[in-house]
A protein has these predicted regions:
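Structured-RNA-binding interfaces characteristic of tRNA pseudouridine synthases
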Residues: 1-307
Length: 307
């Protein structure tokens, strides 16, 4: 559906005041203004899964980086340019999470702009994308959201999964997708208690690396962790699920790394609490490696997911 230039931008849902209020509350003024300028274009969204092993992260690294510095965004843009005829600059591709080098995703959400309609049957566009993308990146869904949708600014929460292989003899199939800790297996009950200390609204400065782009959003290090659960799917196969309103650069990996020092007996729970109170990244242990981490899901207000 094309945007009407005469439409009241503050009332994208007409006389439905409840939806209009929810929409305005979800957008900061500067973000809303930028999206108003984009209304003459169509906007589309995709849910993307990827194996992060061959990539230096999601975010585009600039021209001329070569095969050794491929990014998820770069591959998506390459295929979208072919499919739509747009330039990279006009597509303005954005992602919900700027995942780091080696991190995987099942639920990355991406948006882009297009000056023409891509038709009503967007399943054809999904198939076209998967026909062009490398085998380690897949387009899982392709849809048309609300004209002012933004995959990052509208995100209200995310779930990350982190996998541990704690078996004495590690599975050969876990080497790319789980952190092997069988040489010093964690106490699962202690791991649960350690992860529980992170739940709540607090300052996570001790568990945040300095952002590569020094994002203003990362200058405020207070975040809310809604849950941080530990599941042992089978003996020695451990899955950590962390859900929050947003995350700082490498926060999940740093929290997992710190929790493991408690679960393996190197430190006690008081040590973890002291780290939190210190608000000093230099005092915290090394984070867990990237290959065990998956961006599992991103949450949005329902009002912005459909046109």
């Amino acid at each position: 559906m094309e945007s009407d230039e005469d439409e009241d931008d503050d009332k994208p849902f007409g006389d439905d005041e409840a939806k209009n209020a929810a929409f305005r509350a979800s957008m900061a003024p500067a973000q809303l203004e930028r999206h108003r300028r984009e209304q003459r274009n169509k906007i589309y969204a995709m849910r993307v899964s990827n194996d992060g092993e061959r990539y230096v992260g999601f975010q585009y690294q600039g021209p001329g980086t070569g095969d050794k510095n491929k990014t998820i965004q770069g591959e998506l843009e390459r295929c979208l340019c072919k499919m739509t005829g747009e330039t990279r600059e006009s597509l303005r591709v954005g992602g919900a999470g700027r995942t780091d080098s080696g991190v995987h995703a099942r639920g990355q959400v991406v948006h882009f702009y297009c000056r023409k309609s891509l038709g009503e049957d967007l399943s054809k566009r999904k198939r076209a994308m998967n026909g062009m993308l490398p085998d380690d990146i897949r387009c899982e869904e392709f849809w048309e959201p609300h004209p002012l949708f933004h995959s990052r600014f509208h995100a209200k929460g995310k779930i990350y999964h982190y996998y541990l292989d704690a078996k004495e003899t590690a599975s050969p199939f876990s080497r790319k997708y789980a952190h092997r800790v069988g040489w010093r297996p964690p106490d699962v009950d202690l791991l649960r208690r350690a992860c529980a200390l992170f739940v709540g609204t607090m300052d996570f400065k001790s568990f945040a690396n300095v952002s590569r782009d020094k994002s203003k959003a990362d200058q405020n290090t207070v975040r809310t962790i809604r849950r941080f659960d530990v599941f042992e799917d089978e003996p020695g196969t451990i899955r950590l699920e962390c859900e929050g309103d947003g995350f700082l650069y490498r926060q999940v990996r740093n929290m997992v790394g710190a929790a493991l020092t408690v679960a393996t007996g190197k430190h006690d729970l008081e040590y973890l609490q002291n780290l939190m109170d210190a608000k000093d990244r230099k005092r915290a242990p090394m984070g867990a490696p990237a290959h065990g981490l998956f961006l599992h899901r991103v949450f949005y207000p329902s009002v912005v997911l459909t046109k």
